[in-house]
């Protein structure tokens, strides 16, 4: 094709992509069904991972829950089973009201499987993934959600904690994706969800290891998405989730300027997950919550660094992590004193 003709064709496609993106904002696409599909969630024992599990359960997905904490993971599984029982009761009532003429997918056919897995350890991931394939089947939806934060200034952070943060928050995405992507490629079907953070798009002081891990996983996700497009595997979808500070306790104590905080409060976990689910079920490539994060990311990309610093200082975002780090340090000291260390 003539390069001039191709240039105008590409220009048209780019403009059309803007039109489609605008249409998605105005008219919400229909959500796809995940009923009966195997959905694996890492870090399912608490926080966003638990809420993702409950949302997928309500949509009749068959759940595989991974967490390093066996007890917490089983608690999540119990909540999922309760949802399944409620759905089963509702289906039974609907069948009775319809004299048995309606065909309804009974949730009693769905199960939840729990696995204790440290996703920061490569061999543990691969061994657990093999167990899942043998005991459950192939995974259709992979939600890479597990994450940790050390809560130390760089020069005070032990090397092993930095390595742990990178392993869990970033490297684990490589291992889980390598474990489950091959079958997705074979059948050209699946969905990979990367739960990152707004701190994977812009940074702040005092959380160098966390920001590095989240920037890394955002880069991994974007490259993977491009690789799937290059391979013309359009049946495999990807969604990048980048929420602002979520009120799960992970960053307890983090504060921006008090006059600004009412306009940009920590996100409620339920709201964050519901917004992410809308994006996942409509095959949206990326979601930042709240939408203001799109603007912040754009401004960070075009403004001079000193201008960004001025904005951070005005918002109180330059040292917003310092109270959180101080609380972590105090808690560590209290534990050491309690244990006689």
UniProtKB/Swiss-Prot annotation:
It is a single-pass membrane protein. GO terms for molecular function: all-trans-retinol dehydrogenase (NAD+) activity; all-trans-retinol dehydrogenase (NADP+) activity; oxidoreductase activity, acting on the CH-OH group of donors, NAD or NADP as acceptor. It comes from the Eukaryota. It is found in: Microsome membrane; Endoplasmic reticulum membrane. Keywords: Endoplasmic reticulum, Lipid metabolism, Membrane, Microsome, NADP, Oxidoreductase, Signal-anchor, Transmembrane, Transmembrane helix. Detected in retina, entire eyecups and in liver (at protein level). Pathway: Cofactor metabolism; retinol metabolism. The chain crosses the membrane at residues 3-23. Pfam families: adh_short. NADP(+) binds at residues 40-64. Substrate binds at residue 197. Its EC number is 1.1.1.300. One of its GO terms (biological process) is retinol metabolic process. Belongs to the short-chain dehydrogenases/reductases (SDR) family. This is Retinol dehydrogenase 10. The gene is Rdh10.
